[in-house]
Structures are given as C-alpha cells and as structure tokens.
Swiss-Prot record:
Taxonomic lineage from the root: Eukaryota, Metazoa, Chordata, Craniata, Vertebrata
Residues where heme binds: 458
Job of this protein: A cytochrome P450 monooxygenase involved in the metabolism of various endogenous substrates, including fatty acids, steroid hormones and vitamins. Mechanistically, uses molecular oxygen inserting one oxygen atom into a substrate, and reducing the second into a water molecule, with two electrons provided by NADPH via cytochrome P450 reductase (NADPH--hemoprotein reductase). Catalyzes the hydroxylation of carbon-hydrogen bonds. Exhibits high catalytic activity for the formation of hydroxyestrogens from estrone (E1) and 17beta-estradiol (E2), namely 2-hydroxy E1 and E2.
Gene Ontology CC, one term: endoplasmic reticulum membrane
Glycosylation sites: 69
GO biological process: arachidonate metabolic process; cholesterol metabolic process; estrogen metabolic process; hormone biosynthetic process; progesterone metabolic process; retinol metabolic process
Protein's recorded name: Cytochrome P450 1A2
Species of provenance: Callithrix jacchus (White-tufted-ear marmoset)
EC code(s) of this entry: 1.14.14.1, 4.2.1.152
Catalytic activity: an organic molecule + reduced [NADPH--hemoprotein reductase] + O2 = an alcohol + oxidized [NADPH--hemoprotein reductase] + H2O + H(+); 17beta-estradiol + reduced [NADPH--hemoprotein reductase] + O2 = 2-hydroxy-17beta-estradiol + oxidized [NADPH--hemoprotein reductase] + H2O + H(+); 17beta-estradiol + reduced [NADPH--hemoprotein reductase] + O2 = 4-hydroxy-17beta-estradiol + oxidized [NADPH--hemoprotein reductase] + H2O + H(+); estrone + reduced [NADPH--hemoprotein reductase] + O2 = 2-hydroxyestrone + oxidized [NADPH--hemoprotein reductase] + H2O + H(+)
Record gene name: CYP1A2
Amino acid sequence: MALSQFVPFSATELLLTSTVFCLVFWVFKGLRPRVPKGLKSPPEPWRWPLLGHVLTLGKNPHLALTKMSQRYGDVLQIHIGSTPVVVLSGLDTIRQALVRQGDDFKGRPDLYSFTLITDGQSMSFSPDSGPVWAARRRLAQNALNTFSIASDPASSSSCYLEEHVSKEAEALIGRLQELMAGPGRFDPYNQIVESVVKVIGAMCFGQHFPESSDEMLSLMKNSHVFVENATSGNPVDFFPILRYLPNPALQRFKAFNQRFLRFLRETVQEHYQDSDKNSVQDITGALFKHCEKRSGASGDLIPQEKIVNLVNDIFGAGFDTITTAISWSLMYLVTKPEIQRKIQKELDTVIGRGRRPRLSDRPQLPYLEAFILETFRHSSFVPFTIPHSTTRDTTLKGFYIPKECCVFINQWQVNHDPQLWGDPSEFRPERFLTAKGTALNKPLSEKILLFGLGKRRCIGEVLGKWEVFLFLAILLQQLEFSVPPGVQIDLTPTYGLTMKHARCEHVQARLRFSFQ
C-alpha cells in the first residue's frame, strides 16, 4: 500500500510547508542578537515554535523556573512567545546583577500591562530609569519615611506608623470580637484589608482619607484583580493578539486601574482644596509643599497628576504586601498552635499585660521576629520581583545579555534553596535565631528575598516589616487564633504578583485579656 494514502498532504504542500518553516527559522535566527567573541548566550531549554516556553511555565512559573535552574544554572534564557527573557536564580547571582551591576539591571521592560497602571506613569512599573525617575523615587521614599517611620513630635507614639497601627489594631480586635459574638467565626482577610488600608490611607491623606468610603473598601477587597495580572509572565504582555480577543481578566484589570486612579485623583484634589498649606500633616501634603517650592514664584500650577502618580506608588508599597504578610502569618499560626504559644509566652514575659507592644520592643522579641522572617521565606508570597530589564549590553557570569532584555528575578528559588536553608520545605522559625535563641541571626535573615534588591528595591520595605511586626504583636498579645477541629487550612498559593492562600471562613479568636 502506498505511503501517500496515510499522508493527508500533497508533495507540493509538504514542499511549501518545509520552505516556509525554513524561512521562518532563518528569520528568527537572524533576529537573535550577535554575541561578542569570547562570550556566550545563556543556556535555553528546547521551546515550542511561536509559543516559546509558555506551556512549560504553566500555572506556577516560579516552580517551573526553579526546576529549570537546577538543570541549566542560575542564568538561563526562556522565550515567552518570541520574546527572550533571562531568568536569574541563586542569591549570589541576583546580588551580582542587582547590586554590584545595579546600573545595568535597573530598567523595566516596556510591557503592555504596565501601561495600564496609572496611565503608564507609575514609578514602580514605568520603563524609565533615568535621573527624573531617580529624583521621583527619592522624593517618594523621603515622604514615606517622614510620615511613617520618622518620629511624631505631637504624639506619645514613637512614630506616625506606631500611632496609626496601634489605633487600627485595637479597632481590628474589636471587630473580631463582634464577629465571635455573632457568627462565631470569620474570614480574617477582609478584616486585615480594612485595617491596613486605613493605616496607609491615614499616612497618605491624614484626615482627608475617606476611610469609611464604600468605593475604597471595595477597591481594596478586589485588589486580587491587580496582583493576578501585574505579574511576571502575563501572556497578554507577550502575545499582542490577546489584547484584542475577548479577555475578561484583562478587562477587569483595566477597570480596576481606572477606578483606583479616579479615586486617587478625587482624594488628592479634595486634599489640595481643603488643606492648610502651612501645616503639613501627611504624605500628600508634603508632596504639595515640595511641588510649590519647585514652582517658586513662577506661578505655575501644581502638577497634581504627578502627585497622584507618586501617591499611587506609595499606597501600593504600603498596602498589598503588608496585607498578604499578615494574612499568611495568621494561617501559619492557626495551623501551628505550638508556635503561636511560644510567641505569646515571649510577649507575656517581655511586655506583660500592663501595656501594649511598641516598635521599640522589636529587639526584645526575637522569636516573633523569627516567625515573621520564616513566614516571608516559607510562603515566598512575592515569587518574582517586578520584571527588570537591562539598560545596556552587559555580561553576567560569562553570559552575554543584550540591552533592553527582559529579566525575571526568581525570589522563590532563593528562599527555597537547599544550599542556603538545608530543609527549605520545613516551617521552622528557630532557624533565624542564634544558638542561644536570644537574638536574631542577622546574616541569615539577610538572605531572604521578598522586597527585591538594588536600585529597584521596594521603597516600603522598612514600613512593611515594622507594620507587620506591630500588628502581630498587638493581636497576639490579646487574642488567640484557632480553627475548629476538622477544619483543613489550604496553604497552596495562587500565583500572582503577590501569592495568596485559599480563603478560610472558619478562623476563631479567643480574647486572652483586654485593656478595656
């Protein structure tokens, strides 16, 4: 029987298909950057034509790329569609790139999803990395520090952050008690969202923040729409056709960003109209004053849109990471009650029940600090930094990386590297304590990657660590968290810019004592 009976193509069709394939192959080969003599491109696994490695990445790119790094090394290359992406793993390699060669890797790729955030003017997501961007970053960092971790002369609290967190933590305890008196159980996530958003809102807008706004709470409770789309490897950034096909996730992302930007514009405008220009009480007021100084006597209008963009970045730096960290912490505490008891014993011994915890107590509460660090490491809920890009042709560990190459930083791999941690799958806060168990092992704690490194390091890192500590200290001093017997907690993370655990509606809180 003739072979042609089993082949559904004619010889002409086969010849034409082969010719087209060869042409496409040579075109793509010609598009590859020429590697300077003596260097080489990063190793790359086999990939599908047109699709690249998108199928290999699957629903958990951090796990897939960690597995690839075990075979191909700390510097490897993948393709998402036709776009080359360099993936960095290994703590030393990432430090080399982002710190020692920070100027080479400080860029951001010009991705479609980034253009939808603050109309493409976000300091965190914008591809700009020049002097103007650096000045904006310094301004945002200084404003955030001034009205968060700097001392507050008008308050008995050590700083603005301590004042706001103490207030909202007590309010949170009150809400949880009401829920226990009613349904007798609760989903902690929405309650945490409300508390954290009020803290960052107070620091950004002071008395002008509409903390009871239904729109604000609705936005924050739906922030998962943002983190699910503004993440490393979003197909819409690499396959342009997906922007024009029916795409409900993309439409929700667009709508969320438009709603949030509109809310910020309205709040900033109201703040500008009503605030006392001679009395700066919050971050937005400080930004207004800075812009007035820059405009001088020229009479130029205050660039409110730039202020909105900066406030958007500051708000983001002080909200989602903190909310996610506290939520993960509570899930670990209810699944590991023995750890919760150790923390509460430390709190009872160091602070007692005569006063509330303060930020100045951090050095005397090493086990609580170790628990927070282990939560950061084990959950690795920020699996990748926001993607970087190279600002010029460069080399890393002997591999050539061309200018404007997209770069993924695999923080999850570092936090689960057996060479660093020995038993990375185990949740063990004691790993971060010294041999005597009375202090933190600071060199080891600095090996956790969660906030990035170098010139793009998160401006809210210090704020985040301090806020998580104080919220947990106040909550655990007064409350004991648990779930009823038989309730299973699902700690499997859902991939995103920040990874969330499955929601649990069966958490309970027992009052240990009250200051009332």
